[in-house]
Design a protein with these regions (language model features):
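Regulatory hinge/linker segments at domain boundaries
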Residues: 193-216
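PAS-family sensory domain signal
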Residues: 38-94, 189-196, 200
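Juxtadomain coupling helices with adjacent low-complexity linkers
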Residues: 23, 173-201
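Short alpha-helical "packing" element that flanks the helix-turn-helix/winged-helix DNA-binding module
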Residues: 217-224
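Intrinsically disordered, low-complexity terminal regulatory regions
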Residues: 1-67
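Basic, Lys/Arg-enriched C-terminal extension of HTH/homeodomain DNA-binding domains
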Residues: 2, 252-273
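Sensory/regulatory domains in signal-transduction proteins
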Residues: 63-85, 90-179, 183
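Recognition helix of helix-turn-helix DNA-binding domains
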Residues: 227-262
Length: 273
């Protein structure tokens, strides 16, 4: 039964990811000037696509950084469950109040980190930017647990390549993360080929320009994703089976993945492999 449920979850995540990429492409077309091109017609098409992921596992938001408010949201009511009535600010305060106690510093740490790291990125490198967050745990007001994975990307920028609009995609990966994992991590990739990185892991709180997984670990994980077994991986990379096992364990521990299947999925979602 557990295996069936896990497969269903992975299929749902893959479906959401595919729709996300379609939405991203459409969004770049819609938000291609100071104003929104054919706003009403295009937003209806965008909303139709977004409804493909409507449910309790994911939601998408197009955020306006000029007004500091969502331009469009789909799936957020199902995702967060029942919330008290109020304006956008009150709702955000309520949602942050749902953070599990181990993550109460997340809003402050992540904003401080992101602000500092963004200032370090040269103008010419501010392209193809993607921001991933993973591992933050919330408990809904009805008691249901949520573990967040989010992907954000700018879909319109100003002359200095500061964000005007971003597309933010949030999933509940509660079933992909180990129950005893009490950390979160963030990864920014950017550049023509996504070759530049900034990362942060709450376990050590180190600001880094290295990836969360090493080059060797990613080599191993790519082979795992291609269904190579431990012995085949060891032979392919001229290392021992024990070394393969150690790297696998270290990757699972670092990302908080529940198992190897979840590890591969998380790495693909962040484009580490």
């Amino acid at each position: 039964m557990a295996s069936f449920i896990n497969n269903e979850i992975l299929l749902s995540l893959k479906k959401s990811e595919a729709i996300y990429h379609k939405v991203a492409e459409l969004s770049k077309y819609i938000f291609n000037g100071d104003g929104l091109a054919n706003r009403d017609a295009q937003m209806k098409e965008l909303e139709f696509l977004l409804k493909g992921i409507k449910g309790t596992d994911a939601h998408l938001t197009i955020f306006n950084h000029k007004t500091f408010a969502p331009e469009l949201e789909v799936g957020h009511m199902e995702f967060w469950g029942p919330l008290p009535d109020g304006n956008m600010e009150a709702r955000m305060i309520t949602i942050l109040g749902l953070l599990n106690k181990e993550y109460r510093q997340f809003p402050y740490e992540s904003v401080e980190w992101f602000t500092k790291e963004l200032q370090l990125i040269p103008f010419e490198e501010r392209v193809n930017m993607k921001i991933h967050h993973s591992g933050m745990r919330f408990t809904r007001m009805d008691g249901l647990p949520i573990c967040i994975f989010s992907q954000g990307m700018p879909i319109q920028v100003d002359d200095q390549r500061n964000f005007n609009y971003t597309l933010n995609y949030v999933q509940n990966i509660h079933h992909l993360i180990k129950k005893d994992f009490r950390y979160y991590w963030i990864r920014i990739s950017y550049g023509e080929n996504g070759e530049f990185l900034h990362t942060f892991h709450s376990i050590d709180k180190v600001y880094s320009t290295k990836d969360l997984l090493s080059i060797r670990e990613k080599e191993i994980l790519k082979l795992i994703a291609e269904d190579f077994d431990t012995k085949e991986i060891a032979n392919q990379l001229f290392i021992s089976t024990a070394t393969v096992g150690n790297h696998r364990s270290n990757m699972i521990e670092r990302l908080g993945a529940r198992d190897t299947t979840a590890l591969v999925q998380l790495a693909k979602m962040t484009e580490m492999i």
